[in-house]
Curated annotation (Swiss-Prot):
Family: Belongs to the TrpB family.
UniProt-listed InterPro entries: Trp_synth_b_CS, Trp_synth_beta, Trp_synth_beta/beta-like, TrpB-like_PALP, TrpB-like_PALP_sf
Name of the protein in question: Tryptophan synthase beta chain
Organism (species): Escherichia coli O1:K1 / APEC
Domain of life: Bacteria
Reactions the enzyme catalyzes: (1S,2R)-1-C-(indol-3-yl)glycerol 3-phosphate + L-serine = D-glyceraldehyde 3-phosphate + L-tryptophan + H2O
Primary gene name: trpB
Pfam families: PALP
Summary of subunit composition and partner proteins: Tetramer of two alpha and two beta chains.
One cellular component term from this protein's GO annotations in UniProt: cytoplasm
Cited NCBIfam families: trpB (TIGR00263)
Length: 397
């Protein structure tokens, strides 16, 4: 099938979906390309971002955790966005696209529940019905977000198959969409999946990096040495990276979930520890068994518990433009506690992975003068019960 936009990033990406979904993806690409050129669509999107979601978000300088070092650390505060995370940005764009295509229903998948909440709020705002698939394990560990979705009128369907986590929710959502795409739009929640989703999600998240660039120049008079973001599927990271890719003096650092440790096999770090395969409609690195079956990923944070990664991240990794590292559950938890105790900010466990790597960079070289920006992709209200249970089991509270 010929496409309007390049469906690949190097060798990664593509449209590996059943033939029945090709017309839906073609229609979506056409709607997106025309919307990008339509000043009225852009004005409506920007108005929602500003007056509904609360953009631009703040760039906060850490006051205390850098004490005794020469590091200057800023946080891009996506946690302050309506809905509690960066997810709200791109769902508003996709919901407007759904209306533009004449769709009446939204189908979505969610892990931590943040994309589900964002999908539910956008659907409520724009008068769309909303059905959300969520792994049964995630329904259990993210009950506050499940109730938020239901309060806003969404139907939440627990998925018990497979590992009962995000990858299984993705499979069920795609299955539903293949039978209902004439009236429903599949609101994919990350910068992964079949073309054109990785491109659409990047473009509807790129204001994160655009704002960061303008804000850091205003505050510091120069660009940062590195921007750091957590990577599950990779939408918050690609939103931060997009406007810096051509700024070759700015390091791009993506942080994958190391779970219980890479050596245990219980992690979610396919970029550095997976093999290229085809899954979820795309060619990308993924966690696979010896015989090529998709392996279960693991992370303390439901939103990073995904066995693959967006194709543009795979490309940035293959070219060396971005560096990808991993942070364990324990390291993320320590960073979570540090930010709470010393800056009065409760971060999402996902974002805590990025913060943990920034703290590691700072502590490993305290004399080094460096200007770092962490994308604080979401707030940690949803995670307080998970953290409470872990700390209680350890006897720390």
């Amino acid at each position: 099938m010929t496409t309007l936009l390049n469906p690949y990033f190097g060798e990664f990406g593509g449209m590996y979906v059943p033939q029945i979904l090709m017309p839906a993806l073609r229609q979506l690409e056409e709607a997106f390309v025309s919307a990008q050129k339509d000043p009225e669509f852009q004005a409506q999107f920007n108005d929602l971002l500003k007056n509904y979601a609360g953009r631009p978000t703040a760039l906060t300088k850490c006051q205390n955790i850098t004490a005794g070092t020469n590091t200057t650390l800023y946080l891009k505060r996506e946690d302050l966005l309506h809905g509690g995370a960066h997810k709200t940005n791109q769902v508003l764009g996709q919901a407007l696209l759904a209306k533009r295509m004449g769709k009446t229903k939204i189908i979505a998948e969610t892990g931590a529940g943040q994309h589900g909440v964002a999908s539910a709020l956008a659907s409520a705002l724009l008068g769309l019905k909303c059905r959300i698939y969520m792994g049964a394990k995630d329904v259990e560990r993210q009950s506050p977000n499940v109730f938020r979705m239901r309060l806003m009128g969404a139907e939440v369907i627990p998925v018990h198959s497979g590992s009962a986590t995000l990858k299984d929710a993705c499979n069920e959502a795609l299955r539903d969409w293949s039978g209902s795409y004439e009236t429903a739009h599949y609101m994919l929640g990350t910068a992964a999946g079949p073309h054109p989703y990785p491109t659409i999600v990047r473009e509807f998240q790129r204001m994160i990096g655009e704002e960061t660039k303008a804000q850091i120049l205003e505050r510091e008079g120069r660009l940062p040495d590195a921007v750091i973001a957590c990577v599950g599927g990779g939408s918050n990271a690609i939103g931060m990276f997009a406007d810096f890719i051509n700024e070759t003096d700015v390091g791009l650092i993506g942080v994958e979930p190391g779970g219980h440790g890479i050596e245990t096999g219980e992690h979610g770090a396919p970029l550095k520890h997976g093999r290229v395969g085809i899954y979820f409609g795309m060619k990308a690195p993924m966690m696979q068994t010896e015989d090529g079956q998709i392996e279960e990923s693991y992370s303390i944070s439901a939103g990073l518990d995904f066995p693959s990664v967006g194709p543009q991240h795979a490309y940035l990794n293959s070219t060396g433009r971005a560096d990808y590292v991993s942070i364990t559950d324990d390291e993320a938890l320590e960073a979570f506690k540090t930010l709470c105790l010393h800056e009065g900010i409760i971060p999402a466990l996902e974002s805590s992975h990025a913060l943990a790597h920034a703290l590691k960079m700072m502590r490993e070289n305290p004399e080094k003068e460096q200007l770092l920006v962490v994308n604080l992709s979401g707030r940690g209200d949803k995670d307080i019960f998970t953290v409470h249970d872990i700390l209680k089991a350890r006897g720390e509270i």
